[in-house]
């Protein structure tokens, strides 16, 4: 299935009765073909989805709520189109379930089937909301730099690194990431963290490169994977991890993480803009 066939950008009817058929899978291969990623992935990682608008009825008809966090493996054959995900979660609103465990197991089964891979899921009931505090990316902020920018489509040639000097290890981040939905054209606002070991990357060049996504159209996952590929190709780090946190739309935020070395999966930190 393609993004153009999805509910994204089209009028939709909202059902409040549970319906697993609302989930619309999109093959990762289509977007990866566009940026030159073949069957052997140059990274591993996960997409962290947070859903803030989940509610259902208990066996006595009383509404229940929870925040859901999903971990979708980067090697899953499919992602789920975000509007269909919203419609699917909304279909729980007037459906009765015996317990939160049944809700979790139902969602995990359906989303795993749509993605074609086992998806991890945690539901946070209100008693656990205090665990979900605000945090910001660790590292050195690139946004401190006072510079000119004039390129607003991704251009890997902007990147620079000290290829002839001793390797360094750095963690850098920017809150100036912006791209646009390829179907609706709506802006996607985000923050991105880059952790690497290798030739030192020119900070100003990296910030200009991040800014260059401003008029780019691409899904969140594809943008992060393109950043990963471009930094690997031009800057030649030995180790690289790219982690983006996008602001929510339709009660969902999507946060892709890609790395080529053995790191634990990142914390699901919630930034101030999320």
From Swiss-Prot:
Biological or metabolic pathway of the protein: tRNA modification; tRNA-queuosine biosynthesis
Record's subcellular location: Cytoplasm
BP GO terms, sorted: queuosine biosynthetic process; tRNA modification
Ranges in a coiled coil: none
Gene3D superfamilies: 3.30.1130.10
PANTHER family per the UniProt record, alphabetical: NADPH-DEPENDENT 7-CYANO-7-DEAZAGUANINE REDUCTASE
Family label: Belongs to the GTP cyclohydrolase I family. QueF type 2 subfamily.
EC number, as in UniProt: 1.7.1.13
Active site: 181 (thioimide intermediate), 188 (proton donor)
Cited InterPro entries: GTP-CH-I_C/QueF (IPR043133), NADPH_dep_7-cyano-7-deazaG_red (IPR050084), QueF (IPR029500), QueF_N (IPR029139), QueF_type2 (IPR016428)
Recorded superkingdom: Bacteria
UniProt: substrate binding residues: 80-82, 220-221
Key words, A-Z: Cytoplasm, NADP, Oxidoreductase, Queuosine biosynthesis
Protein name: NADPH-dependent 7-cyano-7-deazaguanine reductase
Residues the entry annotates as binding NADPH: 82-83, 249-250
Pfam families associated with the record: QueF (PF14489), QueF_N (PF14819)
UniProt-recorded Gene Ontology molecular function terms: preQ1 synthase activity
Function: Catalyzes the NADPH-dependent reduction of 7-cyano-7-deazaguanine (preQ0) to 7-aminomethyl-7-deazaguanine (preQ1).
EC primary class: oxidoreductase
Species lineage: Bacteria, Pseudomonadati, Pseudomonadota, Betaproteobacteria, Burkholderiales
Tagged with keyword Iron-sulfur: no
The species this protein was found in: Paraburkholderia phymatum (strain DSM 17167 / CIP 108236 / LMG 21445 / STM815) (Burkholderia phymatum)
Keyword Signal included in the entry's annotation: no
Reactions performed catalytically: 7-aminomethyl-7-carbaguanine + 2 NADP(+) = 7-cyano-7-deazaguanine + 2 NADPH + 3 H(+)
């Amino acid at each position: 299935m393609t993004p153009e066939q999805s509910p994204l950008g089209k009028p939709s009817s909202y059902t409040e009765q549970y319906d697993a058929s609302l989930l619309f899978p999109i093959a990762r291969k289509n977007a990866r073909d566009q940026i030159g990623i073949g069957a052997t992935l140059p990274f591993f990682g996960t997409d962290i989805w947070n859903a803030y608008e989940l509610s259902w009825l208990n066996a006595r008809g009383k509404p229940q709520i929870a925040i859901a966090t999903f971990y979708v493996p980067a090697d899953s054959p499919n992602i789920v189109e975000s509007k269909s995900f919203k419609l699917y979660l909304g279909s729980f609103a007037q459906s009765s379930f015996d317990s939160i465990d049944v809700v979790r197991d139902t969602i995990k089964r359906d989303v795993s089937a749509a993605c074609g891979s086992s998806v991890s899921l945690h539901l946070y009931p209100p008693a656990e909301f205090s665990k979900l505090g605000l945090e910001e990316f660790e590292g050195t902020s690139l946004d401190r730099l006072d510079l000119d920018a004039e390129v607003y489509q991704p251009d890997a040639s902007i990147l620079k690194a000290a290829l002839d000097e001793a390797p360094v290890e750095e963690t850098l981040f920017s809150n100036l990431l912006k791209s646009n939905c390829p179907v609706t054209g709506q802006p996607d606002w985000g923050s991105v963290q880059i952790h690497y070991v290798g030739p030192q990357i020119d900070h100003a060049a990296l910030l200009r490169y991040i800014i260059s996504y401003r008029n780019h159209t691409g899904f969140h996952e594809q943008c992060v994977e393109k950043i990963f590929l471009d930094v690997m190709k031009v800057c030649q780090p030995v180790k690289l991890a790219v982690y983006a946190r996008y602001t929510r739309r339709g009660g969902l935020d999507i946060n892709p993480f890609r790395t080529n070395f053995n790191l634990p999966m990142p914390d699901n930190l919630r930034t101030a803009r999320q």
